[in-house]
Amino acid sequence: MAPKPPKSPKGQKKGKKNMKQQLLVPEEEEPMNMESMGHPEIYPLVLTTKTQEIFNCRVDEDMTDEQTYKLIKKEDILADLQNRAAVSDFHPVKKIVREYPGEELLLVYDKDFKYGLNFYLIGTEDGKENFLKPPEVPEEQEEPKEHVQEDVYVYNPPVSKPWVSLGSEKEIEEESVQESGKRVTYMISRKRSEFGAPVTFSDQNASSVKDAYIECTSYPEKNYTLSQVEKDVGLQVIAEVKDTSTQTKWAFPKNATTQYYPREFSEEEKSLIGKSKSLVDFFNNVSTSVEVALQQNEIMNTFIDDWKNLAEEESTFGDKTDTHLKEYQSFTDLHNTMEKMITCVSWHPTIFGLIVVSVAVRLSYEERVQNSGRLLLQPSLLLFWSFSDPIHPQLMLESPDDIFCFEFCPSDPNIIAGGCINGQIVLWDITAHADRIENIKTGGHRSKKTSLKPMFLLEPDSNKESMYIRHCAVSSIENGHRKVITDIHWLPDSFEINRMGSVFENRSGINCQLVTCSADCTICFWDIRPQKPAVTAAAAASAATTATNNANSQQSPVEKKKEENIDIPFDVPSTFLHLDLSWKPLSRLKLSKGDTSLDHCPTKLSLGEDPFLCKIQGTSSIHIILRDKMLSQIKMVKTSEINPYQNLEAGIANILKPIEDFCTKFFVGTEEGEVIYTDWKMERDSDTGRLMAKKPVSLYTVHDGAVHTIQRSPFFNDIVLTVGGWNVAIWKEEVMTGPLLQTCCGPKRYTAGHWSLTRPGVFYIGREDGNVDIWDLLEKTHEPAQSQNICITMITYIKPWTFSSKQQFIAVADYYGTLHILEIPWTLSHPSLNEVSSVNYYFEREVRHLEYVQQRKEIREQEKIDMALELVKKKAKIYQKTKEQMEAELKLEYESYLDLEKSVLFALGLSKVSEKKSYLDSH
């Protein structure tokens, strides 16, 4: 808004005269000229295309490099000023044009913008004449200049003059750095008693002495504020918004109901209408359209809203911007006085909200030997934790020693197999207690809608008393592992193997075999079915039975029955009674270190997982179908009268043909950080005839510590994640050139890891400082996408679990025996569009990169071999000299000898003048 004009003095009214004076003010302003550059007669102008056409001075047409000026009549310029007024481009020089004495003004085209604009006007007659006719220097004046003698330069020494301040010293002072505070002065001296004593210096660690090293780290200045330069403020005067409503008062309430029913045809009318020609013709006409519509409904949903499907699901529990794991619940065994750590974690396959952990005493081997008597008083347990009761375990499974690994049977979750620290395998059967833990899941009368909202907030009811359950079978101590079992897996129910490692079809349809690895450098395969006895063994058994009966003929049958019943406790199921203390491995595999007599020490292994087992945790439609299929099979086992594990029969692999095209290779991680890809098939030694393991297909020393995790991706069966030491690696099966991804050394040692169950490019890594690194291959491949602190001690195990498409949990176990249940945020549980194909493309690109590196390596090695051969050839080549060259060399050598002889004789004063002869003349 323009400011108001000031009022006229003495209250005079503003009239037209004053307005005219105000309008004439801008015309009286002097136009801009080039007086500062020494040309006061030049006035720069900007001529638009319209003006150039009016005065015929168009650029590159009328005005060129040869013709750079034009004479314009004064009358034409004044006419243009009168017609276009202030719009005219000559308006800034209106005063100059009017006062110009001549009839024509000179307009010059300024192509190089020497004076800032594209044209300039010469406002004086002298300037016009000087431009059109520049003064020429006569030749007579130029010639004497050539003969003028140049001035001789005389050096004048500088003389000091008084300094005149022009303001530059202020700028120098502003740019200079000056100390604002006083310096702190320290005086360090020795004791007076040590004056004059010899001084000896030595190295000292700054961290070992208190207050020996003080670090001054940088930090952001809190007092720094950014001044606000501009601010947009809007104001509007409106009335306040008011909410008003009206409602008719219901003075006399009255209950009333109305019911409608359709009018129906009678039986006669129905028969007549059904036989009518119009109805038949109608069905004949529309039958084709109805069939097409039904086919379309079978092919695709024609009523789907594609626009809504472009967006991702909004109905989630957390915020999409939240990327951190949230603590949901934690479990700690408060009843055990011994300090224990969690060694293994597994979610129940069918009961949501039930998680099982194994605990072990935090003692070394020497400490275990010293405290062996105390350890016998504390039972080794598997704890069943429920979200409804975080204090009391629901079940506690006893074992002969601490369990370091266990796994649920995929065919029947009531069967659990575990590996002990003493090398024994333990089997539990909790079928008799299945109702107890299933009732915990339902938690009384609860609706389906309630179970989907903050889950597992259940009343513990009468489940506060923990129940101890004994194992039903353990393996033989003499024939099993000698050291701690580090990993255990159930073989898929689709196949079984024999003692040679050959693969056969498993027609029983249930999981009957296990594989274990131990620190005693062995990998064992186990079969839970009874072995079929041979004829000789049966005869020996019958003979032994006869001898026993003869020796115990004095005992009555009743006493014998009592003795047999005493050996079997009443609370132990007889499912695997045939294995107890007599269970032997089906085959034993040792990974030899080549020429030496030592063997590799396996810590983790990964078989070729069955797709039905590895994809059961997905959230897509096929995953839901597979999960429902597994649950239906388990339900059929429960409803059937006979459990298939109650009446196990010996395998029929001996009468079947082996499967030839089955992949029998698997990954093994060792204690030295090696990743081995080997075959479990055995071969006979040609010298000794004994069964031996095949040579490993490939061996890589990637990790600088023991391998803690080997796991296949739930989305790509040939992609394997390995965690050990200070780094992480991702491998692809059948790719022998190396890992697809190998991270750099982390800040702390890695102790656990697991793939995400719903995002193919995400995996979780646990560290020894209690942090969890979350890797996202689509975001970063050189470092974790984010890192979050979970506890203050080492993380020992990580296990995620998907409850529904909206909620996902991850269990993190630590060294102090605490199990942390964390809720995974929306961004880490929901894959992006085409994430599977994007991650697959990344792996394929890395495979091509490895192939290229291998090709370059082979080419470089071949180049080195070729260069070595060429060097050998050059050295072996003998240079043959000609006769003339040999004579010339001898001549030079003889002449140098004569010169030396002459110099020696001359130095001794025995020199004689003699004619020098050549070497050829002397001969």
From Swiss-Prot:
Residues in a coiled coil are: 869-889
Q: What is the protein's quaternary organization?
A: Interacts with ACTR2; this interaction reduces binding of the Arp2/3 complex to the VCA domain of nucleation promoting factors. Part of the multisubunit axonemal dynein complex formed at least of two heavy chains and a number of intermediate and light chains. Found in a associated with the catalytic heavy chain DNAH2, the intermediate chain DNAI4, and the light chain DYNLT1.
Task: Sum up the protein's function in the record's words.
Answer: Acts as a negative regulator of cell migration, invasion, and metastasis downstream of p53/TP53, through inhibition of Arp2/3 complex-mediated actin polymerization. Via its association with the multisubunit axonemal dynein complex, is potentially involved in the regulation of cilia function. May play a role in osteogenesis of dental tissue-derived mesenchymal stem cells.
The places in or outside the cell where this protein is found are:
Cytoplasm
Q: Does the keyword Repeat apply?
A: yes
* GO annotation (BP), single: negative regulation of cell migration
Any idea which GO molecular function terms this record carries?
Arp2/3 complex binding
Superkingdom as given in the UniProt entry: Eukaryota
Report where it is expressed, by tissue: Strongly expressed in the testes. Detected also in brain and lung tissues.
List GO terms (cellular component aspect): axonemal dynein complex; cytoplasm
The species this protein belongs to is Mus musculus
Could you tell me which SUPFAM superfamilies the record lists for this protein? Answer: WD40 repeat-like (SSF50978)
Q: Where is this region: Disordered?
A: 1-35
Name of protein: Dynein axonemal intermediate chain 3
- UniProt KW keywords: Coiled coil, Cytoplasm, Repeat, WD repeat
Give residue ranges of the WD repeats.
Answer: 398-438, 480-536, 702-741, 745-785
* Inactivation phenotype: Deficient mice shown no overt abnormalities in body size, development, behavior, or fertility.
Q: Which portions of the chain have biased composition (kind: Basic residues)? A: 10-19
